[in-house]
Amino acid sequence: MKALTTLTDPVYVEPKKFSRYEKFWLKYMNDKRDLPFIHLLTAIHILVIPVAVLLYTPLLDGWYWWLLYVPYFYVSQMYFKGRFGLMLHCICHRKPFKKQYNWLFSYVIWFVCPFFGHTPETYFAHHMGMHHVENNMDDDASSTLPYQ
């Protein structure tokens, strides 16, 4: 059996004070440790979604389209995709929003996920319904044990 070493995972350190923006979101959230996800979603809404919408309109063509697409691809797929995937994993395990604001979770799943290649509800169905139902053991087809 493998001996576990000292835990090196990052831990939450509460800031001395929250910004007004963070205080606004904390009213809707279950756990203040999920605030980095709000910051990530804000950046995605500013940098990724407007450009993606612009790329799918007939406003740009030819070289102008490509000049916008190349940085869009880098930002969305190289910079944000991994961060978004980690956030999606975490919010599937622990719902970030209070029950009466769960529509915000649905908004992320149904509106934001397609910008990163996820069809609505499929990540949750696979991850929680298939992967974790097998308890992530060796006989699980999507086991992560060999990578630990």
Each PLM stretch: what is its role?
Residues 1-87, 91-148:
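Non-catalytic, topology-defining segments of multipass membrane proteins
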